[in-house]
Amino acid sequence: MTTSDHRRPRVLVSTDIGGTDPDDFQSMVHLLLYADVLDLEGLLSSPYGDGRAADIHQVIDCYERDFDQLHRHAHYPQPDALRALVKQGAIDRADHHGRTGTTEGSDWIIQRARVEDERVLDVLVWGGLDDLAQALHDAPDIADRLRVHYIGGPNTMWSVNAYSYLEAHHPTLTMIESNSTYRGFFEPDPDDPHPVDNEQFVREHVAGHGALGDFFAAQLPRVKMGDSPTLTWLLHGERTPEAPSWGGRFVPLWADRRRYFTRLTTAADQVEVNAVLEIAPPLPEGYGATDHAHLLVDGREQGPCPDGVAQAGSITFRLSVYRLGEVPYRVRSTHPGLDGLEGAFTSVPPSPEKAATPSADHPHWWTDDPDPAQAIGRALGARWVSRYRSEFLGDFAQRLRRCLPGA
Protein backbone atom coordinates (compact mmCIF):
# COMPACT_ATOMS: atom_id res chain seq x y z
CA MET A 1 0.00 0.00 0.00
CA THR A 2 2.48 2.59 -1.19
CA THR A 3 0.47 4.80 -3.55
CA SER A 4 -0.90 8.11 -2.35
CA ASP A 5 -4.65 8.18 -1.74
CA HIS A 6 -6.57 11.31 -0.84
CA ARG A 7 -10.03 9.80 -0.65
CA ARG A 8 -11.96 10.03 2.61
CA PRO A 9 -10.41 7.29 4.79
CA ARG A 10 -12.33 4.41 6.34
CA VAL A 11 -11.16 4.24 9.96
CA LEU A 12 -11.52 1.65 12.72
CA VAL A 13 -9.82 2.34 16.07
CA SER A 14 -8.79 -0.27 18.64
CA THR A 15 -7.88 1.37 21.94
CA ASP A 16 -6.96 0.48 25.50
CA ILE A 17 -8.73 3.65 26.66
CA GLY A 18 -9.41 3.68 30.38
CA GLY A 19 -6.47 1.37 31.02
CA THR A 20 -3.00 2.35 32.13
CA ASP A 21 -2.56 5.73 30.42
CA PRO A 22 -5.05 8.64 30.27
CA ASP A 23 -3.68 9.91 26.96
CA ASP A 24 -6.02 7.59 25.04
CA PHE A 25 -8.88 9.81 26.24
CA GLN A 26 -7.06 12.80 24.76
CA SER A 27 -6.60 11.04 21.43
CA MET A 28 -10.27 10.01 21.38
CA VAL A 29 -11.27 13.68 21.79
CA HIS A 30 -8.87 14.48 18.95
CA LEU A 31 -10.41 11.78 16.76
CA LEU A 32 -14.01 12.87 17.30
CA LEU A 33 -13.22 16.49 16.44
CA TYR A 34 -12.09 15.24 13.02
CA ALA A 35 -15.02 12.86 12.55
CA ASP A 36 -16.38 15.11 9.79
CA VAL A 37 -13.50 14.19 7.45
CA LEU A 38 -13.38 10.46 8.25
CA ASP A 39 -15.66 7.51 7.65
CA LEU A 40 -15.53 6.08 11.15
CA GLU A 41 -16.38 2.37 11.07
CA GLY A 42 -15.47 1.07 14.51
CA LEU A 43 -14.40 2.10 18.01
CA LEU A 44 -13.12 -0.99 19.81
CA SER A 45 -12.25 -1.27 23.49
CA SER A 46 -9.25 -3.59 23.86
CA PRO A 47 -8.00 -2.90 27.39
CA TYR A 48 -5.10 -4.27 29.42
CA GLY A 49 -6.57 -3.14 32.72
CA ASP A 50 -9.89 -1.75 33.82
CA GLY A 51 -10.84 0.07 30.60
CA ARG A 52 -14.06 -0.94 28.88
CA ALA A 53 -16.37 0.20 26.09
CA ALA A 54 -18.04 2.49 28.63
CA ASP A 55 -14.92 4.67 28.55
CA ILE A 56 -15.44 5.33 24.84
CA HIS A 57 -19.09 6.16 25.51
CA GLN A 58 -17.93 8.68 28.11
CA VAL A 59 -16.11 10.66 25.40
CA ILE A 60 -19.09 10.37 23.04
CA ASP A 61 -21.28 11.83 25.81
CA CYS A 62 -19.04 14.92 25.77
CA TYR A 63 -19.29 15.00 21.98
CA GLU A 64 -23.08 14.97 22.29
CA ARG A 65 -23.00 17.97 24.63
CA ASP A 66 -20.97 19.86 22.01
CA PHE A 67 -22.92 18.56 19.04
CA ASP A 68 -25.13 21.65 18.59
CA GLN A 69 -21.96 23.65 18.02
CA LEU A 70 -20.15 21.02 15.94
CA HIS A 71 -23.24 20.47 13.80
CA ARG A 72 -22.81 23.98 12.39
CA HIS A 73 -20.07 22.37 10.32
CA ALA A 74 -21.09 19.73 7.79
CA HIS A 75 -20.64 15.97 8.04
CA TYR A 76 -20.25 15.44 11.78
CA PRO A 77 -21.97 12.11 12.60
CA GLN A 78 -24.84 11.98 15.05
CA PRO A 79 -23.82 10.86 18.57
CA ASP A 80 -25.99 7.75 18.34
CA ALA A 81 -24.27 6.80 15.08
CA LEU A 82 -20.96 6.87 16.94
CA ARG A 83 -22.38 4.85 19.83
CA ALA A 84 -23.39 2.13 17.38
CA LEU A 85 -19.72 1.75 16.39
CA VAL A 86 -18.52 0.99 19.94
CA LYS A 87 -17.65 -2.68 20.47
CA GLN A 88 -16.04 -4.55 23.34
CA GLY A 89 -12.86 -6.34 22.39
CA ALA A 90 -10.50 -8.66 24.21
CA ILE A 91 -10.16 -8.25 27.97
CA ASP A 92 -7.46 -10.90 28.37
CA ARG A 93 -4.18 -10.95 26.46
CA ALA A 94 -3.65 -13.39 23.61
CA ASP A 95 -2.25 -16.82 24.39
CA HIS A 96 1.02 -18.24 23.04
CA HIS A 97 -0.68 -18.85 19.68
CA GLY A 98 -1.88 -15.25 19.42
CA ARG A 99 -5.51 -16.11 20.20
CA THR A 100 -7.97 -14.60 22.66
CA GLY A 101 -11.09 -16.29 21.35
CA THR A 102 -13.53 -14.41 19.14
CA THR A 103 -14.78 -11.14 20.63
CA GLU A 104 -17.36 -8.60 19.58
CA GLY A 105 -14.43 -6.41 18.57
CA SER A 106 -12.55 -8.99 16.50
CA ASP A 107 -15.76 -10.00 14.74
CA TRP A 108 -16.48 -6.34 13.93
CA ILE A 109 -13.05 -5.99 12.27
CA ILE A 110 -13.96 -8.92 10.01
CA GLN A 111 -17.38 -7.49 9.18
CA ARG A 112 -16.02 -4.08 8.24
CA ALA A 113 -13.09 -5.50 6.28
CA ARG A 114 -15.48 -7.56 4.14
CA VAL A 115 -17.63 -4.59 3.17
CA GLU A 116 -17.54 -4.02 -0.59
CA ASP A 117 -15.44 -0.87 -0.84
CA GLU A 118 -12.43 -0.06 -3.00
CA ARG A 119 -10.82 1.79 -0.11
CA VAL A 120 -8.57 0.05 2.38
CA LEU A 121 -9.79 -0.17 5.99
CA ASP A 122 -7.37 1.81 8.15
CA VAL A 123 -7.05 0.05 11.52
CA LEU A 124 -5.53 2.39 14.10
CA VAL A 125 -4.23 0.39 17.06
CA TRP A 126 -3.80 2.44 20.24
CA GLY A 127 -3.21 -0.51 22.54
CA GLY A 128 -2.64 -4.22 22.04
CA LEU A 129 -2.93 -6.14 18.78
CA ASP A 130 -5.00 -8.91 20.34
CA ASP A 131 -8.33 -8.26 18.59
CA LEU A 132 -6.62 -7.75 15.24
CA ALA A 133 -4.70 -11.01 15.66
CA GLN A 134 -7.90 -12.86 16.54
CA ALA A 135 -9.67 -11.39 13.51
CA LEU A 136 -6.89 -12.63 11.25
CA HIS A 137 -6.95 -16.04 12.95
CA ASP A 138 -10.65 -16.28 12.16
CA ALA A 139 -10.57 -14.64 8.72
CA PRO A 140 -7.11 -14.62 7.12
CA ASP A 141 -8.70 -13.55 3.83
CA ILE A 142 -9.18 -9.99 5.13
CA ALA A 143 -5.46 -9.26 5.51
CA ASP A 144 -5.03 -7.57 2.13
CA ARG A 145 -7.98 -5.26 2.85
CA LEU A 146 -6.37 -3.73 5.93
CA ARG A 147 -3.77 -1.04 6.55
CA VAL A 148 -2.67 -1.13 10.19
CA HIS A 149 -1.02 1.80 11.98
CA TYR A 150 0.16 0.53 15.33
CA ILE A 151 1.58 2.46 18.29
CA GLY A 152 4.01 -0.18 19.54
CA GLY A 153 6.79 0.11 22.10
CA PRO A 154 5.14 -0.54 25.48
CA ASN A 155 2.11 -2.03 23.74
CA THR A 156 4.25 -4.75 22.14
CA MET A 157 5.59 -5.58 25.59
CA TRP A 158 2.02 -6.28 26.71
CA SER A 159 0.71 -7.94 23.54
CA VAL A 160 3.85 -9.74 22.40
CA ASN A 161 1.97 -12.96 21.59
CA ALA A 162 -0.41 -11.17 19.23
CA TYR A 163 2.48 -9.26 17.67
CA SER A 164 4.52 -12.44 17.25
CA TYR A 165 1.60 -14.14 15.54
CA LEU A 166 1.09 -11.30 13.05
CA GLU A 167 4.79 -10.98 12.29
CA ALA A 168 5.19 -14.73 11.70
CA HIS A 169 1.87 -15.70 10.09
CA HIS A 170 0.80 -12.53 8.27
CA PRO A 171 4.10 -11.12 6.98
CA THR A 172 2.45 -9.48 3.94
CA LEU A 173 0.08 -7.44 6.11
CA THR A 174 0.36 -3.70 5.48
CA MET A 175 1.66 -2.43 8.82
CA ILE A 176 3.12 0.82 10.11
CA GLU A 177 4.79 -0.02 13.43
CA SER A 178 5.60 3.12 15.40
CA ASN A 179 7.68 2.18 18.43
CA SER A 180 9.05 5.66 19.11
CA THR A 181 8.23 7.93 16.16
CA TYR A 182 4.95 8.75 17.92
CA ARG A 183 6.86 10.47 20.72
CA GLY A 184 7.41 13.44 18.44
CA PHE A 185 3.78 14.35 19.05
CA PHE A 186 4.58 15.53 22.58
CA GLU A 187 8.39 15.90 22.47
CA PRO A 188 9.42 19.38 21.24
CA ASP A 189 11.68 19.50 18.20
CA PRO A 190 15.19 20.40 19.39
CA ASP A 191 15.63 22.59 16.29
CA ASP A 192 12.46 24.63 16.89
CA PRO A 193 13.39 28.00 18.46
CA HIS A 194 9.79 28.53 19.65
CA PRO A 195 8.38 25.09 20.50
CA VAL A 196 4.77 24.67 21.56
CA ASP A 197 4.58 24.32 25.33
CA ASN A 198 2.42 21.29 26.17
CA GLU A 199 0.89 22.73 29.35
CA GLN A 200 0.36 26.21 27.93
CA PHE A 201 -1.40 24.73 24.91
CA VAL A 202 -3.94 22.98 27.15
CA ARG A 203 -4.51 26.10 29.25
CA GLU A 204 -5.01 28.40 26.26
CA HIS A 205 -6.55 26.23 23.55
CA VAL A 206 -8.21 23.24 25.23
CA ALA A 207 -9.63 24.00 28.69
CA GLY A 208 -12.86 25.97 28.44
CA HIS A 209 -13.50 24.83 24.88
CA GLY A 210 -16.72 22.90 25.28
CA ALA A 211 -17.32 19.61 27.01
CA LEU A 212 -14.69 17.88 24.88
CA GLY A 213 -12.02 20.45 25.70
CA ASP A 214 -12.74 20.35 29.42
CA PHE A 215 -12.74 16.55 29.39
CA PHE A 216 -9.39 16.52 27.58
CA ALA A 217 -7.83 18.93 30.08
CA ALA A 218 -9.16 16.93 33.02
CA GLN A 219 -7.26 13.81 31.90
CA LEU A 220 -3.82 15.44 31.85
CA PRO A 221 -2.93 19.13 32.19
CA ARG A 222 -0.58 18.82 29.20
CA VAL A 223 -0.51 17.49 25.67
CA LYS A 224 0.45 13.85 25.34
CA MET A 225 -1.87 12.27 22.76
CA GLY A 226 0.63 9.52 22.01
CA ASP A 227 -1.82 7.64 19.77
CA SER A 228 -2.80 10.66 17.69
CA PRO A 229 -0.04 10.29 15.05
CA THR A 230 -2.09 7.43 13.60
CA LEU A 231 -4.83 10.00 12.92
CA THR A 232 -2.64 12.89 11.76
CA TRP A 233 -0.89 10.52 9.32
CA LEU A 234 -4.25 10.29 7.54
CA LEU A 235 -4.97 14.02 7.75
CA HIS A 236 -1.79 15.38 6.17
CA GLY A 237 0.60 13.89 3.66
CA GLU A 238 0.50 11.35 0.85
CA ARG A 239 -0.63 8.42 3.03
CA THR A 240 2.46 6.49 2.01
CA PRO A 241 4.76 5.38 4.84
CA GLU A 242 7.99 6.61 3.24
CA ALA A 243 6.67 10.15 2.69
CA PRO A 244 6.88 12.86 5.39
CA SER A 245 3.59 13.67 7.10
CA TRP A 246 2.05 14.90 10.34
CA GLY A 247 2.13 11.28 11.51
CA GLY A 248 5.76 10.58 10.70
CA ARG A 249 7.91 9.03 8.03
CA PHE A 250 8.86 5.36 8.15
CA VAL A 251 11.30 2.90 6.62
CA PRO A 252 10.82 -0.73 5.54
CA LEU A 253 11.16 -3.34 8.28
CA TRP A 254 14.45 -5.22 8.22
CA ALA A 255 15.14 -8.91 8.69
CA ASP A 256 16.42 -10.97 11.62
CA ARG A 257 15.00 -8.95 14.49
CA ARG A 258 13.64 -11.91 16.44
CA ARG A 259 16.03 -13.82 18.73
CA TYR A 260 15.67 -17.36 20.07
CA PHE A 261 17.84 -18.90 22.79
CA THR A 262 17.78 -22.49 24.05
CA ARG A 263 19.25 -21.41 27.38
CA LEU A 264 18.94 -18.67 29.93
CA THR A 265 20.59 -15.58 28.50
CA THR A 266 23.26 -13.35 29.99
CA ALA A 267 23.96 -9.64 29.72
CA ALA A 268 26.38 -10.45 26.90
CA ASP A 269 23.44 -11.49 24.71
CA GLN A 270 22.14 -8.58 22.65
CA VAL A 271 18.50 -8.26 21.61
CA GLU A 272 17.04 -5.52 19.45
CA VAL A 273 14.72 -3.20 21.36
CA ASN A 274 11.00 -3.82 20.65
CA ALA A 275 11.76 -7.12 18.88
CA VAL A 276 10.45 -10.53 19.92
CA LEU A 277 12.72 -12.56 22.21
CA GLU A 278 12.13 -16.22 23.08
CA ILE A 279 14.08 -17.87 25.89
CA ALA A 280 13.62 -21.66 25.89
CA PRO A 281 15.77 -23.51 28.45
CA PRO A 282 15.38 -27.28 28.92
CA LEU A 283 12.52 -28.50 31.09
CA PRO A 284 13.76 -29.80 34.43
CA GLU A 285 13.10 -33.40 35.33
CA GLY A 286 9.71 -33.91 36.93
CA TYR A 287 8.05 -30.77 35.51
CA GLY A 288 4.42 -31.88 35.29
CA ALA A 289 1.06 -30.80 33.93
CA THR A 290 0.17 -28.98 37.14
CA ASP A 291 3.42 -27.01 37.25
CA HIS A 292 3.69 -23.49 35.92
CA ALA A 293 6.32 -20.80 35.53
CA HIS A 294 6.63 -17.16 34.53
CA LEU A 295 9.32 -14.50 34.25
CA LEU A 296 9.65 -11.42 36.41
CA VAL A 297 11.28 -9.05 33.91
CA ASP A 298 13.23 -5.95 34.89
CA GLY A 299 11.68 -6.02 38.37
CA ARG A 300 8.22 -5.24 36.95
CA GLU A 301 5.99 -6.76 39.63
CA GLN A 302 2.99 -5.20 37.88
CA GLY A 303 3.76 -7.22 34.76
CA PRO A 304 3.67 -8.34 32.14
CA CYS A 305 5.15 -11.59 33.43
CA PRO A 306 5.54 -13.92 30.43
CA ASP A 307 4.19 -17.40 31.06
CA GLY A 308 6.35 -20.38 30.27
CA VAL A 309 4.96 -22.77 27.66
CA ALA A 310 6.21 -26.34 28.01
CA GLN A 311 6.71 -28.17 24.73
CA ALA A 312 9.20 -30.57 23.14
CA GLY A 313 11.40 -30.82 26.21
CA SER A 314 11.82 -27.10 26.78
CA ILE A 315 9.91 -24.24 28.37
CA THR A 316 9.55 -21.11 26.26
CA PHE A 317 9.16 -17.58 27.60
CA ARG A 318 8.26 -14.96 24.97
CA LEU A 319 8.78 -11.26 25.64
CA SER A 320 9.61 -7.87 24.19
CA VAL A 321 11.08 -4.81 25.89
CA TYR A 322 11.10 -1.14 24.94
CA ARG A 323 13.85 0.00 27.34
CA LEU A 324 17.46 0.11 26.19
CA GLY A 325 20.22 -1.34 28.35
CA GLU A 326 20.70 -4.40 30.52
CA VAL A 327 17.42 -6.15 31.39
CA PRO A 328 17.51 -8.67 34.26
CA TYR A 329 14.89 -11.36 34.82
CA ARG A 330 14.08 -14.10 37.31
CA VAL A 331 12.03 -17.27 36.94
CA ARG A 332 9.16 -17.90 39.33
CA SER A 333 7.85 -21.44 39.25
CA THR A 334 6.12 -24.14 41.21
CA HIS A 335 9.00 -26.40 40.22
CA PRO A 336 12.14 -26.07 42.37
CA GLY A 337 14.35 -26.77 39.37
CA LEU A 338 13.23 -23.50 37.77
CA ASP A 339 12.17 -21.28 40.64
CA GLY A 340 14.69 -18.57 41.37
CA LEU A 341 16.80 -19.00 38.23
CA GLU A 342 18.10 -15.68 36.96
CA GLY A 343 19.34 -14.26 33.69
CA ALA A 344 19.66 -11.05 31.73
CA PHE A 345 20.11 -9.66 28.23
CA THR A 346 21.04 -6.31 26.76
CA SER A 347 18.48 -4.39 24.73
CA VAL A 348 20.15 -2.44 21.92
CA PRO A 349 18.93 -0.07 19.20
CA PRO A 350 18.83 -1.25 15.59
CA SER A 351 21.83 -0.30 13.53
CA PRO A 352 21.24 1.85 10.42
CA GLU A 353 23.45 -0.60 8.51
CA LYS A 354 21.21 -3.57 9.34
CA ALA A 355 18.10 -1.54 8.67
CA ALA A 356 19.35 -0.67 5.18
CA THR A 357 18.33 -4.14 3.96
CA PRO A 358 14.53 -4.54 3.98
CA SER A 359 12.98 -7.83 5.02
CA ALA A 360 12.02 -9.84 1.95
CA ASP A 361 9.36 -11.57 4.05
CA HIS A 362 7.62 -8.34 5.13
CA PRO A 363 7.22 -6.30 1.93
CA HIS A 364 4.57 -3.93 3.32
CA TRP A 365 5.75 -3.58 6.93
CA TRP A 366 7.22 -0.24 8.01
CA THR A 367 8.80 1.03 11.20
CA ASP A 368 10.82 3.83 12.83
CA ASP A 369 13.64 5.48 10.91
CA PRO A 370 16.87 4.37 12.70
CA ASP A 371 18.87 7.37 11.44
CA PRO A 372 20.21 9.05 14.62
CA ALA A 373 19.69 12.44 12.96
CA GLN A 374 15.91 11.84 13.08
CA ALA A 375 15.84 10.84 16.77
CA ILE A 376 14.96 12.91 19.82
CA GLY A 377 17.19 11.46 22.50
CA ARG A 378 16.63 7.72 22.21
CA ALA A 379 13.28 8.07 20.42
CA LEU A 380 14.09 6.96 16.88
CA GLY A 381 12.12 8.73 14.16
CA ALA A 382 10.51 11.23 16.53
CA ARG A 383 11.75 14.28 14.62
CA TRP A 384 9.66 13.20 11.65
CA VAL A 385 6.62 14.13 13.76
CA SER A 386 7.93 16.87 16.04
CA ARG A 387 8.89 19.13 13.14
CA TYR A 388 5.17 19.54 12.42
CA ARG A 389 3.99 20.17 16.00
CA SER A 390 3.07 23.81 15.47
CA GLU A 391 1.05 22.84 12.38
CA PHE A 392 -0.98 19.93 13.72
CA LEU A 393 -1.52 21.44 17.16
CA GLY A 394 -2.56 24.71 15.53
CA ASP A 395 -5.05 22.78 13.41
CA PHE A 396 -6.32 20.98 16.51
CA ALA A 397 -6.79 24.34 18.26
CA GLN A 398 -8.98 25.48 15.37
CA ARG A 399 -11.08 22.34 15.75
CA LEU A 400 -11.51 22.93 19.46
CA ARG A 401 -12.85 26.41 18.75
CA ARG A 402 -15.74 24.73 16.95
CA CYS A 403 -17.01 23.70 20.39
CA LEU A 404 -17.49 27.34 21.42
CA PRO A 405 -20.89 29.05 21.06
CA GLY A 406 -21.25 30.76 17.71
CA ALA A 407 -18.06 29.27 16.29
Which residues are covered by each model-predicted region?
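N-terminal acidic, glycine/proline-rich low-complexity segments
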Residues: M1-A407
